[in-house]
Amino acid sequence: MARITVEDCLNQVPNRFKLTLAATYRARELAQGHAPRIDSKDKPTVTALREIAGGHTGLEMLRKVPT
């Protein structure tokens, strides 16, 4: 079972609203077939949170989104 907490992610991204956006965009990328940056057999949402908690991805996800 996947155990990841918001507190683990907030160490990397202190604003929980930006954390939600970054995790959403990364999970969407993973669901579309992008390669995960960590070894994980979890669903895209959990994998995205694990990547953020591990420092493998973060707020740069927000800079990739066209405005």
Swiss-Prot record:
What is this enzyme's EC?
Answer: 2.7.7.6
Q: Which reaction does it catalyse?
A: RNA(n) + a ribonucleoside 5'-triphosphate = RNA(n+1) + diphosphate
Sorted keywords for this record are: DNA-directed RNA polymerase, Nucleotidyltransferase, Transcription, Transferase
State the Pfam families in the record: RNA_pol_Rpb6
GO biological process: one example: DNA-templated transcription
Name one molecular function that GO assigns to this entry: DNA binding
**InterPro entries named among the record's database cross-references:** DNA-dir_RNA_pol_omega, Pol_omega/Rpo6/RPB6, RPB6/omega-like_sf
Q: Which GO terms describe its cellular component?
A: DNA-directed RNA polymerase complex
Record keyword Transcription present:
yes
Function, as annotated, reads:
Promotes RNA polymerase assembly. Latches the N- and C-terminal regions of the beta' subunit thereby facilitating its interaction with the beta and alpha subunits.
Mind telling me which PANTHER family this protein's record contains? DNA-DIRECTED RNA POLYMERASE SUBUNIT OMEGA
* Assembly and oligomerization: The RNAP catalytic core consists of 2 alpha, 1 beta, 1 beta' and 1 omega subunit. When a sigma factor is associated with the core the holoenzyme is formed, which can initiate transcription.
Q: Which family does it belong to?
A: Belongs to the RNA polymerase subunit omega family.
List the protein's name. DNA-directed RNA polymerase subunit omega
Q: What taxonomic lineage is listed for the species of origin?
A: Bacteria, Pseudomonadati, Pseudomonadota, Betaproteobacteria, Burkholderiales
